[in-house]
Amino acid sequence: MSSHKSTTKSSSSGSSMSLILGFSKSMEKGNYNFSKENKKNRSFGVLYAMIKGNTFPRILTIISLLIEFCQLSSFGFKQQYPWGGDAGYYLKRIMSPVSHPSNLVGYNGFTIFFWIVIGLLLLGFFNIWYVAYQFYRGKIANIWIIRTLRWFVSTTVAVLFIPIISLLLIGLDCDYSQGGILKTFSNDNIYCFKGANLSIAIVSIILIIVFSIVGFTSSATYYEYDTNVKSRFSKPHARFDVYILFVKLILALLNSLVDFSPWTTSIVYFILSITLVFGSIIILPYNNQRLNQVKSGFYTTVFWVSFMTLVTMGINDETTATTCYITIVGAFFAFPIGYFSNRFYYNWLSSKIDQLKLPTSSSTNDFNEITKNEKSKTGDSKEKESSSPSKVTWGKQPITLGSKRQIIFPFFQNKFVMSFFVEIMVRKLLRSSNGSNGDDGISSNSNESIEHANNLYQCGLQYFPNSDLLWMAYCNFLFTVRKDRHIGYAALEKLRRMKPSFDVRFFIYQRDKEREQIMDSDLRGPEHTGKIQDFVSYMEFKKLYYGAKRHHVKCLTYIKKFWGLLLHETVDLHRLSDLSGRIATTENKANESYERLLALNPNSVRVLRDYSQFLEEVVKDTESSYKLQKKAEAIEDIMSKSQTTDFKTIDIKNLDNSDTELDQVLKQESNAIQLAKIDADIERSGSKSGSSKSKDDSSESSSSSKGRRGKYKEFQQSNAINKLSWLMIGTTACCIIFLIVMLIVLRDLSVKHTHSYQGIISITDCASEAVSIAINLNTMQAISISAGSVAFPFEAAEAMITQYRKQNDRSLIIMKNIHDAIYWGEGDPTSYVGDNLSKLKSINGFDVFDIGSTIFSFEEFNRSSTLVDNKEMIDIYSTPSVNMTILVSPPGTNSTNYITVTQTYNAWKAGNSFYESALIANKMSVQDIKDRAVFDPDFKFIILNAPSNIPEMYMKIQQVYIKSLIDDINTTLDTMLYVWVAIFCFLIILGAVLFRPIVTKISREKIRTLVLFSLAPKDVVFKLSSKKIKMTSLDSGSERDNLFDTTDDDAADGIDNHEHLQVDERKKNDDIIDDGSIVNRSINFGSHRRPLMNSTNVLASTTTINRGTISNRLNEDHDKVPLIENSISNNNKGYGWDGKSKRNLNKKSLRSVLRRLHWSYVLAIFLLFGFITMGLWVTYSVVHDNTQSGYVLGKSCSRSLDSRIINYYIAELYTFDNDANENEALEAVLQLQSNHQSLPYLEDVRPLMEGSYGCWMLNKSNCITSDSIYYNDVSIGLDWLVDQYTKHSVSLVNTDPSLLSTSPELGWMQAIGSDVVFQGLDTATFTYFQYYLSQKDWATKVLTSVLAISCVLLLVIHLLLFRPFMNHLRIQHIHTLALLRLAPDDIRFMEVSDKVIDED
């Protein structure tokens, strides 16, 4: 009655995605056979590796949903929309970076961020290609590669799709009206398809296409369909997710490329938001209904934002924030509207189930009968229910695949009904019958509810027979809920024949893979009892299993080879030692692999049997072997009780519990050993390896298992290797500690260096303040002499002198504080500079405080500098070394003559005397200055000493200060060098004293053990060398060996490098042995680890071989195992020891190998020495370059001081007291010119010197304007200004005193020869200071990086070279001693004399 629906609705749910997913059919080729999927299903193999078991856990799903809501909402607050007021401004500022984080940085930041993201994307794409290529080669990629691939897909597609696409679109967002300039960075004039952005544009176009394909493909398959998985939110399909991704792509494209048309973007945003709301409500993507309601609430809020965006566009008023507030308030109402709309729709759709009507007839062909008892209890009630044809009956119906019977459901006859409605109704049936409203898990549903759901699916398939989405949901229901795998696989085959869409075909592929894992039950164990649940763990398990088998067979083969070498007439101990190491290596690897396998899945029968055989044949631990064997048999008994491969949870007990069925079986046997102990032993021994089961490379150390280590405790009597190991650890630790100490010392030295730069400037500024005080006093004297005339009244002079007196008061305080700071050893003299440099530091971000307002006490100084402790600094401050000129009072009171004398002061008292005299002179009244300044001792003390003696004193202090700094640095570096040489010598002595005896002891123990084996009777050697190798489950599943990348360190073996452990090759080798012609030598030597058997068990398990069957012995080269002579007469001399004659032993080659241990330690020491010496050399070169910078900075400071001294002498020319000294003035000019010409012309100083710097005045109002006659002198640059300054100074010195007042040079000096020159030179000094400070910071970073890298390198060398070497040595040494278990009892405890060991 509803067959007409099949044509109109056959693919109602799948057709909507055909355009997006149609391309995917070309990706899938071939059938779904696992054996061919590595060649024909590469695309699905990659997707399966990415998706299976990798969907977000519940909490991450909720977080991703919140992130998606924020990203979609942010499209309504783009810059093109006129959101008004402060609220609109902040909304656009906050919400826009959610989808465009690069908006927060400039073009350079965008470029860096862009290429970082591109690099990560390319790594992800390369990862995809690599996994696909490995599938193409028929191998499985590295487990960590697959894990990173899964992380890449989870984060980039599910969370970061919008930010990544938006970032790629920034480089394509062009404004063609301005010639194709990038809109986002229009101020930088970056062209889209020119210059630096061309590569960005091309890469963006390519990656948008590739990333979109990857995103859509993975989104279509990125979901958890199994409702029994409690850790994740399940959903039946992901087609709505594909549409959401499509919406995100459209919105990102429009808002990046069409943002010039806000009406277009806002309308599209509104339409897409509506579709998201209705889609989330109608499709109900998640099985968890509450999550569906939350999702609809979010999308309704996004719809509200899009609607208000349209309203804002219509109002177009950026002055009011009304729409912003309405949007924010309305969002709180939009969410519950969407939330409850979704809930109402779900309840309405679920209520339609009551219309379902079933036929009343029942059938005996029900496939899934419960039990006869259940039928007898429930039969009557069900017959009553089925008696009424008008009532919905849920009795047993004939269950056939895609039932042809007419199940009446009028609701499905409506045109608007879609096939996925069936699956939504089934959710309600399963959930309501169990009384659950929020959980999506249905594993505890009653059989009745499952039958109800099955009937509903049967009805849906009747109305929608060609809906691949409905068939997929039904298959999933049969597998996960009804657990009816037979009908499920039949339904899967029918779905396969329907040629379904891409996502459904991938579902089929997943089911095929899971079926293969279930069929591989001897690896997995019973269902739900193993731990192999996801694809990655399953692949890791299989890879480990085949690796364990390889190492197992190799170990047995090397044992045969070991005994075969003893058949030589001359026994080469080197080859025996080499084979013993190979035996130890392969045994250790096999043991570790088996333990990791049991940690992954303790109930795998095949692993239990193989490990049991390994323990019996190799380790000779019969007790543990028996326990594992009994456990495997018990598991097989339980598995054999099932009639099918469907091992349900109710049928299998937990095999690890003490009261399980398995334990009950074992307890019935009187001689059985309880499994709890072996499980505990396995858990204990494999705890470390099992906890890191995701690692693909097993550790080379036996320390990963305490249980295994205990098996060889009896062979660890010698602590020689432990001592050697601690010696290597101590050597590396000593070197690393030295580097860390050196790093701390150098960083402390860097801080001192920074403060020393500050101190150099401070000392010179102290002298500059002294000269400035003298200049002001000279000016005050000149003013007082001129005062009293009509043109210059006394009151005007008084005001001017008061102003100069205030300047001197501040200069005196600054000078006193600097003088005390240097003397007391101020640790951080950053603030102790003059006003000019203090302002420059403050402008450039230095933390400075005012030192010109008060004099600091002794306690207020940070007295942490060690430079003042230098001997020369102490001498200059404590011994008389500064010549000061003092005025001697004349003998007569009216005499105008005066004389001066020179007295010697120390620097501390000279500075204090200058300060005290200046303080007195500065307090003189105008009249006193006019009348008595010429004869005042304090006034003249300042005038006579300020231009020469005081600057000379402070320059001497500066030079000693710099020299003290260099001496301190050199002393520190020399100390580090001496300490390192001492450490190196100590390590060499330590090696000579301790290392050599330890190595000698190890060598002797190894030779002693091997000599014992050379004494084994030849009949025992024949038997052990001829033992046939056979594994109980070797051939099982071996055809899949080629699925795994089995490459390891076997390729490094130099002997018989042709073993790949193929089945045919193993059989061939075994056949050779059966013929009795050759000792099996086809197995490759390789790797390194663990021990073996005792002689009793070996002899008991060895097959006896008649001597007459031994083939003729052939001569072979030294590197091959020799053939055994076929017929050896009893009268002939037999190979192997006959117990009488002397054994021929070759010890030379072994001794040469053991001597290499000495050179290994020497190489280790020189490696450490090389890295540390390299770090020291870089440190010395960088620090040495920086030490010379103090002299350059001091010379720049001296230039500023010279300019002030020249200005002082020029001022004296018109003070009328005959104190002018032309010679000293010319010397000051020469000194200024010399310093100026000898300073390096740094790139940072070039703008200031050449005029491009602009005005350097601290107060910009004092800058020389272009209309000034002196503008050209200043605008050309400081270099020209200094040159003019020196020329004018020389000219003034040689000018007649009577013409000074009218000299143009004097006017030039008064206009720009003071503050303009002073501030320019101070700015140059600060520029030098900043440059060398940056160089020091760079040097500190270099030193830190070099030393830190050296520390890391030393640690890496120890971990990658020294530690593996010691572990390798320890394993081989211990296992060589453990080989004594192979020796017969009559030689096992023999004593070998030292003479035999020492002789060659």
Swiss-Prot record:
The chain crosses the membrane at residues 59-79, 112-132, 152-172, 196-216, 240-260, 266-286, 296-316, 320-340, 726-746, 975-995, 1162-1182, 1342-1362. It is a multi-pass membrane protein. Keywords: Membrane, Transmembrane, Transmembrane helix. Residues 369-386 have a biased composition (Basic and acidic residues). The keyword Transcription regulation does not apply. Residues 367-393, 683-712 are annotated as: Disordered. InterPro entries: HAT, Tiny_macrocysts_regulators, TPR-like_helical_dom_sf. It is found in: Membrane. GO terms for biological process: cell-cell fusion; RNA processing. Disruption phenotype: Null cells have increased numbers of peripheral cells during sexual development. Indistinguishable from the wild-type cells with respect to the cAMP response. GO terms for cellular component: membrane. Pfam families: TPR_TmcB. This is Tiny macrocysts protein C. The lineage of its organism: Eukaryota, Amoebozoa, Evosea, Eumycetozoa, Dictyostelia.
